[in-house]
Structure formats: structure tokens, C-alpha cells
């Protein structure tokens, strides 16, 4: 079971933009190999930073509106939102250390 909640076009504003804590958004698709590689890393981050950040996933096939709104061209793309604004992003399957360092800047 994934530690990250699934977010849709209709719940993105409520779950991400209106969040009181920073949010890591994993834009992914079921057919994407690198997305499957980074998924366990995203889950580890969700557990490691529980209570400090919220971690959610957006399936770009099922939710094209949010993906196009944020200019998602390749997946996986991991974006960090804080106070309703995109503050950082990482593209591609990255190691946990890279993702942690990126997140730490926004806590």
C-alpha cells in the first residue's frame, strides 16, 4: 500500500494548494518504468517526513488538467508546493538523498 494519497484534477486544489504543510506531488503514469522505480522512494519519503509534509500522487493519464496546468512534459516529475505555490521540482527517477535534500530546503 502506498503511503501517498492519490489526488485528482478535482481534489488537487483542496489537497495541494490549500494545504497547511508543504506538499510533494509525484506526477506519474502506470506505463512509466522510471515512475515505478521512484515510487518506493516517494513512499519512504512520505514515512520519513510524516507530519512535516504531505505526499500525494497524480496519475497524469487520468488527470491531464493538472498535468498540463503545471507543464508536465516528462514523468516522473516531483513538485514541491508550499503555501499554494510551486517552489521546486525534480524531474526523473532520482535517489532518495536528492529528494530529501530538495525537500529540506522548504521545511
UniProtKB/Swiss-Prot annotation:
**Cellular component terms per the entry's GO annotation:** cytoplasm
* Origin: domain of life: Bacteria
Disulphide-bonded residues: 32-35
Please name the GO terms that the record assigns under molecular function. protein-disulfide reductase activity
Q: Which residues form the Thioredoxin domain?
A: 2-107
What single Pfam family name could you report for this chain, choosing any that match? Thioredoxin
InterPro entries, from UniProt?
A: Thioredoxin (IPR005746), Thioredoxin-like_sf (IPR036249), Thioredoxin_CS (IPR017937), Thioredoxin_domain (IPR013766)
Tell me which CDD domains the record gives. Answer: TRX_family (cd02947)
Q: Does the keyword Transport apply?
A: yes
Decide whether keyword Disulfide bond is in the record: yes
Record key words, sorted: Disulfide bond, Electron transport, Redox-active center, Transport
Please state which protein family the record places this protein in. Belongs to the thioredoxin family.
Query: What is its biological role?
Result: Participates in various redox reactions through the reversible oxidation of its active center dithiol to a disulfide and catalyzes dithiol-disulfide exchange reactions.
Tell me what this protein is called. Answer: Thioredoxin 1
Q: Which organism is it from?
A: Nostoc sp. (strain PCC 7120 / SAG 25.82 / UTEX 2576)
